[in-house]
Amino acid sequence: MSIPKIIHYCWFGGGTISPENRKCMESWEKYCPDYKIIEWNEQNFDISKNRYVQQAYEAKKYAFVSDYARLAVVYEHGGIYLDTDVELVRPLDELLELPGFMGFQTNNEVATGLGFGARKGNSVVQALLRDYDALDFLKADGSADLTPCPERNTRVLQALGVRKDGTRQSIAEMEIFPAEYFCPMDLYNRKLRVTPKTYSIHRYAESWKPKPGAVSRILQRLLKKHYYTWYCPLRGRIERRLRKRT
């Protein structure tokens, strides 16, 4: 059984897809012309099926809704998921005979937003889904859990045997590829290194994030992933306390 020729993408919240992302999506039709493309949104995906997802949706943190939804639709239907800012540079057909595939980012975390695929009912995708079962998006203090899905998913994959070293490896029903296959653009400095092995480029449009000012851009470069997992939550707590005093 092959991975079906379906490309899934998520677009929750009803916003407009940017021209830059539309251009990326045009590459899907160019290199996968016989694939069915399905958009998943609040009209055809059950937000209430998972507490974490429902809380994230109500908080209008739609990227975190997609973190779960992409796993669910690939598990239930099979196929390939792509973020809207993923540009294909060659066909994906030769990946269809694998039971499943994912890729490392340049920081050696596995990221489903780069693009991943699997047959319906894939056991590794199921394990990633189950990790969300006991999670709340909202913490006890009312703040949001902004743990990025690559960090969360990679912990689960490590428990299944993945080595966080960026090398090609196989676990159960999943092939994990080095960054050059699906992530030739560096996560932090945005340098692009396309090779003959590259299938796609994740453009890191990050339309769900507020546009940073000069100070924030400097902090992002210095703190890297800790900017969103440590600095932003801390800043949010301080801002809430200040608002309560006014």
What positions do the PLM features span?
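Glycosyltransferase-associated regions of secretory-pathway enzymes
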Residues: M1-S66, T84-T246
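Small-residue hinge/turn detector
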Residues: Y68-G79
